[in-house]
């Protein structure tokens, strides 16, 4: 999420500064010169060593932070992170048979409350939405990352150390480096943890965004995340059509020899979309510091249009694709407006294969080849926003109540608000996995269940093959949609064991459910079972991005993604989702706007759970 220095009830936006109860004040945007990077090979920059235990835990300043003002409510987006051009809602689709919530929790083991909005306030000194979920598990440690803090737990949920600020962890300036989109991965091959995050800079003199941004990558020195780490970065400012581009929404994948990071490139100071970007690093090379090259793989030759939301796969227990000199598989969807599709629907997925990845071994001459196949699937489309069960939403109610607003916000400007909705994503591909020769993926889609359009999930299991002539082909082994009558299923993330047992982590929210963390298991024929609740929501989400007093436009934030991780020690799947773990009334909020369980400006939490399928 975007961040600037700020005080009082102000909060920073990448597009400018908003003050509670007033209109937007456009910040000047500085665009200094910077050397071109472009496609090809470059060197990672070392940011030095780091430890989780050594991160400071102090309050630097107070404030609210989100991404861009409305972060892409209209085509052309905004000057911020987590952009999305696709308009939510207004689409209709054929009927889908709904699943049920059966009240059981098969295979559920450890399940505990993870990081929440108050951890940002206590550790970083500000609050933001949404969390953006990172999760990786190995050697009895569970590492959770969100915007913009992290925590290491034991498998029973006990904290192994302090909550840490990710700017400290990545050796970034705490005041002028803005952070977004963390993710992480534990690699059993190297017995290392890998983490990545986007950072983009503000000018130290003015606080204005200056257009410079980079991806930071951290690698643990051992299989213990509480030990030492080494931090690298590579600049992505020039990776796109503009003089200044932002490497939005970085996601991590890995195979036998490589670590892969994908981004969506947008012009930093203008409207437009520059396409997905793919970067390849030597997995062992950055772990032992023997090979710090990063290869920017061009995508234009593999697809005529602009690929969007490209998701690299990870593989449980080193079950990598070994053919064609090592292969990393990726998936992308085609319904988003960034691809040039203005209908909001599509019947194709992009299956990608980056071969020759054995050449990412330390010191080897790199010879990577990228191929793509368009795989025909059932029609899917951009989902509508998700409504939630009626309940107390004291922040929104306070903005509408003179007595509360005067006491809490020192303002007499009352504005009416109703209970907000949740973002349901934009049909971009969610977390992907390669296991037992198959690629698993899921995306958010509009579904019609019980005669009503709702947000649901489409899931895919695809077998990639390469013909004797070297042509990549994807065959759909299984596909389907998950829908829940009167409710919504959103932000799915596949977790798969080496034997192909699959769990789909997801959110459950709607007329019957406060925002909850759930999951679905699949049988051997890839048929989904009922929805199970791992962490039941106890109240509505009630965050500042739901209310135009703070944002100047309406894009309620949720997600922006969930995460799963395979635990090689137990054979289980870990999952982390956003949910709402607290509730309080307007009366309680007026007396104490934290209610002892939330922030004045929001109430999101995360749930971390273990499932053995």
Write out the residue ranges for each language-model feature.
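Secretory targeting and sorting signals
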Residues: 2-35
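C-terminal PAP-associated
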Residues: 29, 34-613
